[in-house]
């Protein structure tokens, strides 16, 4: 197994999290860190760790050839020794030492791609509550669609592919103008979506460092939304209808609340919240979501809808400069 981490100016995160990846209980694996023209001490951190871990490999890209992560990812894949690739990020750490084992146990000849889950670390702030809820919402959507053999995206913080999938991907072979979303476009370019499976074992989850200020979070989400406009039309339609239906629910409720149908509106609203709370509770239990999200999810959903509207508009016109 080849674990690949693309890093750009990630010295602090690598010093915190990389050893969680290196200390996995797996018979034979390598960890490849591709230093994408960093200007901090990323390479020095890796070289120091190499003294203790023979499985750790460093590839340094001296000059920035592209604003996207694609060149770094390509370089890592082509340099890998094994037939399967497990992706994660510098700011991530597996929750257990069995991460590689559990993810790889889902692989088969007919299922060469495994989508994992990567929740964010919890901290008591409203931004973090938004991040926690949005991550849960996104995971329910992309994991459930993958189970239906209709996958449309993956999370590069925790995803496994056969090396052949990378080499055969049009996104891997050809340059595009996108600066992010290489993981998503790999799924979009797969002809047989039945070859994708998921891992819901909690010990296969990978914790990720969340943004702690609104500006950084907004910039990160804009990159994600920019990629979504390049999904297949059917996937864009599905996501569009999902968000529009949620927005219509809240707008309709507010309009009817100040009409002569306010009693009916309140009844339907309460029943809907109850049913959704049950399902969100089930999803949260499976995906180990933070408990505060369960208590205030209606507030978070309403706020997130407004934020997603702005992100959707911004993602349509935003010109990205770099993957970081």
Placement of each model-derived feature along the sequence:
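Short, well-formed alpha-helical segments that are part of the catalytic scaffolds
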Residues: 10-23
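Catalytic donor/gating beta->alpha subdomain of glycosyltransferases that bind UDP-sugars
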Residues: 107, 113-138, 164-167, 171-236
């Amino acid at each position: 197994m080849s674990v690949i981490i693309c890093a750009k100016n990630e010295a602090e995160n690598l010093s915190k999290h990389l050893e969680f990846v290196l200390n996995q209980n797996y018979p034979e694996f390598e960890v490849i860190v591709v230093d994408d023209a960093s200007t901090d001490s990323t390479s020095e951190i890796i070289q120091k760790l190499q003294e203790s871990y023979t499985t750790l490999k460093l590839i340094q890209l001296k000059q920035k050839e592209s604003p996207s992560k694609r060149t770094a990812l390509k370089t890592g894949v082509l340099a890998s020794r094994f037939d399967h690739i497990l992706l994660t990020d510098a700011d991530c750490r597996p929750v257990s030492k069995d991460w590689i084992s559990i993810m790889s146990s889902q692989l088969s000849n007919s299922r060469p791609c495994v989508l994992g889950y990567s929740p964010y670390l919890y901290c008591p702030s409203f931004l973090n509550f938004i991040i926690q809820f949005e991550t849960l919402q996104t995971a329910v959507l992309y994991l459930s669609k993958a189970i239906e053999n209709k996958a449309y995206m993956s999370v590069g913080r925790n995803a496994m592919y056969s090396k052949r999938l990378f080499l055969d991907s049009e996104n891997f072979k050809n340059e595009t103008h996108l600066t992010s979303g290489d993981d998503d476009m790999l799924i979009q370019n797969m002809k047989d979506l039945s070859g994708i499976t998921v891992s819901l074992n909690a010990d296969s989850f990978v914790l990720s460092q969340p943004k702690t200020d609104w500006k950084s979070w907004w910039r990160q989400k804009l990159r994600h939304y920019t990629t979504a406009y390049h999904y297949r039309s059917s996937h864009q339609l599905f996501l569009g209808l999902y968000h529009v239906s949620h927005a219509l629910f809240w707008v309709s409720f507010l309009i009817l609340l100040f009409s002569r149908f306010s009693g009916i509106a309140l009844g339907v609203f309460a029943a809907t919240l109850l049913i959704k709370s049950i399902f969100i509770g089930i999803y949260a239990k499976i995906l180990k979501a933070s408990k505060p999200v369960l208590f205030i999810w209606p507030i978070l959903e309403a706020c997130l809808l407004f934020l997603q509207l702005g992100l959707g508009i911004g993602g349509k016109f935003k010109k990205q400069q770099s993957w970081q």
